[in-house]
Amino acid sequence: MKIIVHRGTHQIGGCATEIRTNQNGIIIDAGSELEGNTLMSIPGATEGKSNCDAVLFTHYHVDHIGLIESINDDIPLLMSELTLDILKLQNNRQKLFNTKIIDRITPFVTARTLSFGDIKVTPFMVDHSAFDSHMFLIEADGKKLLHTGDFRTHGFRGKGLLPTLKKYIGDVDVLICEGTTVNRSTKKSKSEFEISTEARKLLAENKYVFIVCASTNIDRIAAFCSAVPRGRYCLCDLYQKTLLDTVNEKAGLLSSLYTFPKMLTYSPALDEKMKQQGFCMFVRPGNYLSSRVMEQFKDKDPLVIYSMWQGYLEKNVSLQNALSGFRIEELHTSGHADLEAIHSVITEIKPKVIIPIHTEMPEVFKKYLETKLPCDGEEIFL
C-alpha cells in the first residue's frame, strides 16, 4: 500500500490524500485552501490519463470539496446522500460549482463496503460541524487504514464514535488523523450540550436575539432551537429552513433533535408579533433580509450571539460592519477533535503508524505511537 498526502501535512484545510495498491487507487477529499486559491496537481486525477478509481468526500466543507471541478471527468465522485442533498442546496444558492459536476456525484451508504479493484472502503458517520460527515476504513494489501476526516466527540452524536471504532473498526495498521486544534489549546472543548445550556440562559435574559452561525452547522442550530423559551418565536430565512427540512426528512426519524418543530420561516407579517413576544432569529449578516430585520430591531437593544470561529470575524470587515453597534456575546465550540478525543481514538484502535493531516503542528502527534510526518506529495510505503 502506498499513501500520498498531496496537501494537508502542515496546513489546515485544502486536503487530498491518495491511497494506492499496485493495481488501484482512490483519493479522499479534494479541498481548496482556506486562504489563497492554489490548485493541486495530482497526476492521474487532475491531469493526464486517469489512474484513479474514485474520489470520496468526507463532507461538504469547501476545504474538503472545493477543488472537485479539477478532477478528471471520467473519475467517479462519491459522498453520502445527505451530504449531496445539502451540497445541492448550497450550490443552488451560492453557485459554487458547475451543476454538471454535482450531477456526476454518486451517494454511498453508511457502513456499506465499496470495492475499487483490490481496495475496499467502508464509510462510517462521525460527528462534525458539517452534518453527516464520514470517516473511511480502507482495506488493501492485507492492511487496515482509518482516515478520520474531520471529527469530534463533543457534539450531540460524538458519543457514538468509540463504540463504532470498537465494533466495526478494531485495531488498524495506519491512522490518518486530523489535528486542526492541537496547536490551539490542550483544554477539553465545550460540548454542544453546554452551548445549549448557556444559550438557554441568554435567551431567557434577552427578549430579542439574533444568532450568527453557519447555516449548515445543523448541530449548532439544534442547540439553540432547543433552548428557545416557550412562547418565543424561533425564526430563520427560507434558505435556512429548506436546509433544516432536508435534514429533518433524512435524520428526523432517528432523533427528534433534528425535527426543528419550533422553527418558522420569517415573514414581515410576523414583525408585530415578534415585537410583542420576542424572538430568536438565525441571520446571515450581509444578506438583505437579515440586515433589514436586524436594523429594524436595533433600537430595541437586541443581543447578537456570534457562534462561529473568531477568526472569521477578525478577518471579515463586512461582517464586522454588519454587527457594528450591536451587543455581541460569543458562544461557540469547535467542530474539530480536541486532544482528548484524538487520544481516545488512538487508544481504541491502536494504530502501528499515525499520519497527521489537516494540522499546522503534526509534531504534536509524536507523543503517541510511531508517527510519520511527511511533506505534501511525499510517498509513504507500507
Regions found by a protein language model. Name each.
Residues M1-L56, V62-D219, A223-S226:
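His/Asp/Glu-rich metal-coordinating catalytic cores
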Residues E18, H134-E348:
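Metal-dependent phosphodiesterase/nuclease catalytic metal-binding core
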Residues H61-D63, L84, T110-A111, Y239-K241, ...:
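Short, polar loop motifs at secondary-structure junctions
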Residues E69-N72, L114-F116, M294-D299, E363-L369:
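Short loop/helix-cap segments at secondary-structure boundaries that form the rim of catalytic
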Residues R104-A111, Y258-P268, K372-P374:
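Short acidic-hydrophobic, aromatic-tinged amphipathic segments that line or gate anion-handling sites
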Residues T110-L114, D301, C375-F381:
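Glycine-centered loop/turn motifs
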Residues E329, E348-I349, E363-L382:
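Short acidic, glycine/proline-enriched helix-loop-strand junctions
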Residues I354:
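Hydrophobic, well-ordered secondary-structure elements that form the walls
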